[in-house]
Amino acid sequence: MAAPRVFPLSCAVQQYAWGKMGSNSEVARLLASSDPLAQIAEDKPYAELWMGTHPRGDAKILDNRISQKTLSQWIAENQDSLGSKVKDTFNGNLPFLFKVLSVETPLSIQAHPNKELAEKLHLQAPQHYPDANHKPEMAIALTPFQGLCGFRPVEEIVTFLKKVPEFQFLIGDEAATHLKQTMSHDSQAVASSLQSCFSHLMKSEKKVVVEQLNLLVKRISQQAAAGNNMEDIFGELLLQLHQQYPGDIGCFAIYFLNLLTLKPGEAMFLEANVPHAYLKGDCVECMACSDNTVRAGLTPKFIDVPTLCEMLSYTPSSSKDRLFLPTRSQEDPYLSIYDPPVPDFTIMKTEVPGSVTEYKVLALDSASILLMVQGTVIASTPTTQTPIPLQRGGVLFIGANESVSLKLTEPKDLLIFRACCLL
């Protein structure tokens, strides 16, 4: 009998403090559905499910026919399972980390360097930048998902400068006036002026930031108590961020960055040098294998202000333009493909109606990881006929060039996400 190249995985759960608590977390619910022995602690956060080979969360193999305990060990000894191009391009490593995130309190405002800058930062300060790789990311909403992403159109920033004097005070009159004057100029002039404004904010003295933030919080609180709607300056969000991160400079970032609320199935792609933050909700995420993060606020951690201000992409765009749209497969009516402009990963979303009795997962020249978000199936392959039961929360590794047949065991819709590398 051929050695199995398709097998279920037990994946690592990260209990970071910002995660949703207990069974409020989609991560916890997926875990409980897939593992009847899982004990969900209602007083603990379940922030991330990691599906991949990262050293801090290497997936365990749930197949007693396989001697290797973890996915990274198995891939090291079965290099052809990656796919020929993937193996050669990424030095025999799985190039992506696949995740589910359940966010209760905001993650830090951050950006990730491109490869060239990552190599430089890693050499200069490995304690802050642990590897030399870039870290593009994509998030696809499972529930309504709120985040900050990329610089707003300049017209919107100028409006906030008028409406929020505390914001203008930190930017400074000269930089703010210059931004207003360059609104109709070419993109290079706009980017330069935007960089100047953002740098003024980030380089403000902590004492001054705290003073201005306290003034703004007091003003919003008083106006709200008087029954006035403060949503034109994101009053409720500002108060929430200040409560969670009092005195943090990142509270003012909401006036610079687009605020997105993704509906389930909508996505945002975070390329190198784009400032972003996840605020609340559940999502599927995929990224290149890297831990390099340059933080900008909403964090007690190290903020490298000079690197941050120098590296960011100061190209304004609307929140609508920040949405990343999938393409529908020509071969499979149930398949949507989220294929970002980086080689490291692609995400496929499959929605199969419950009226279908069997669905075939097509073979790819890439290793892939499949996550069952909804539905119950029996999986089988042409090479190894041993059936694999999969239900909500189940995770399956699929070696390159392997197809998988999924037999629906009940008339309920399937929702499946699959991470792969399409070179």
Curated annotation (Swiss-Prot):
Quote the Pfam families the UniProt record gives: PMI_typeI_C, PMI_typeI_cat, PMI_typeI_hel
Its main subcellular localisation, reduced to a broad class, is cytoplasm
Subcellular location(s) of the protein: Cytoplasm
Among the GO molecular function terms of this UniProt record, one is: zinc ion binding
Question: What's the protein called, per UniProt?
Answer: Mannose-6-phosphate isomerase
Residues modified as Phosphoserine are 102, 108
List keywords of the entry alphabetically: Acetylation, Congenital disorder of glycosylation, Cytoplasm, Disease variant, Isomerase, Metal-binding, Phosphoprotein, Zinc
Name the tissues where it is expressed: Expressed in all tissues, but more abundant in heart, brain and skeletal muscle.
Group of enzyme by EC:
isomerase
The UniProt similarity line reads: Belongs to the mannose-6-phosphate isomerase type 1 family.
The record's active-site residues are 295
The record describes how the cofactor is bound as: Binds 1 zinc ion per subunit.
